[in-house]
Amino acid sequence: MSSQSHIPYAVRASRHSNPLARQLFQIAEEKKSNVVVSADVTTSKELLDLADRLGPYITVLKTHIDILTDLSPTTLTSLKSLASKHRFLLFEDRKFVDIGSTVQKQYHGGSLRISEWAHIVNCAMLAGPGIVDALAQTASTPEFRSVYANEVEGGRALLILAEMTSKGSMATGAYTQLSVEAARRHRAFVLGFVATRALNDVLPVSTVDGDEEDFVVFTTGVSLSASGDALGQQYQTPTSAVERGADFIISGRGIYAAEDPLEAVLRYREEGWKAYLERVKGWKA
């Protein structure tokens, strides 16, 4: 895969064919932030409080909405309002991993109503490429696009889980290659990958149908203090993640569980942005 990580966000925004990618890069440039907060909290109050306090300093808020013990329609309405107020995107870390017809119903329908509020979702490739085909099919229908593919809603997009940061992960080799192949078939809907690095060595190519590809890389497991935990999570620092090709760095406990989450998010923003500027400083048009 051809990485564009050496190019500034503003330039990538001006060139990108995916509307949500353009918006994402624009937000990052405006806020001088490449931080994604993984808000793995269990009550609506905690989630909405974090969204309101940290929203001005982040590009994306990542949720596991099904771990909320008191989820209600009001929670989702309030979350959307805060995303609009503070200009950040919502990423539901659902990791769809079922047959196509099932994930279509999980995404666009069901009790969580994910497509109605999440700008970004993700999937794993364990069920095969049909899962990406199915989600892209749903997102391409005239009915879906008329509701969500507009400036107010901001569009919808998919990240493919190409690699994981947990020790012993099987998301390697042929699995990662399959992820890239699936993304290339649906470039209008696939924003990029959740990966530990830029995937330059996976099916290298510079253009697709004459158009230079630019998949966005989100890296999880970013921490300023820890190297791992008792459950096999392996961490990178903001600097090392960006140096390895991360466009956006995802941190959870390092921010939301900090004594002062606001102070923590500012530290992550400062280090992540400094690493980004160092990465693109040699770029010339």
Swiss-Prot record:
Quickly give the catalysed reaction. Answer: orotidine 5'-phosphate + H(+) = UMP + CO2
- The enzyme's first-digit EC class, named in words, is lyase
Q: Give yes or no: UniProt keyword Transport.
A: no
Lineage of origin: Eukaryota, Fungi, Dikarya, Ascomycota, Pezizomycotina
Supply the PANTHER family for this chain: OROTIDINE 5'-PHOSPHATE DECARBOXYLASE
Originating organism: Paracoccidioides brasiliensis
What keywords tag this UniProt record?
Decarboxylase, Lyase, Pyrimidine biosynthesis
In which pathway is this protein known to take part? Answer: Pyrimidine metabolism; UMP biosynthesis via de novo pathway; UMP from orotate: step 2/2
Q: What is this protein called?
A: Orotidine 5'-phosphate decarboxylase
Q: Which GO terms describe its biological process?
A: 'de novo' pyrimidine nucleobase biosynthetic process; 'de novo' UMP biosynthetic process
Which residues are substrate-binding? 40, 62-64, 93-102, 235, 253
Q: What is its EC number?
A: 4.1.1.23
Q: Where is the signal peptide?
A: none
- In the UniProt entry, which residues are flagged as the active site? K95
What would be one Gene Ontology cellular-component term for the protein?
cytosol
One Pfam family, please name it.
OMPdecase
* Family named by the database record: Belongs to the OMP decarboxylase family.
Task: State one molecular function term (GO).
Answer: orotidine-5'-phosphate decarboxylase activity
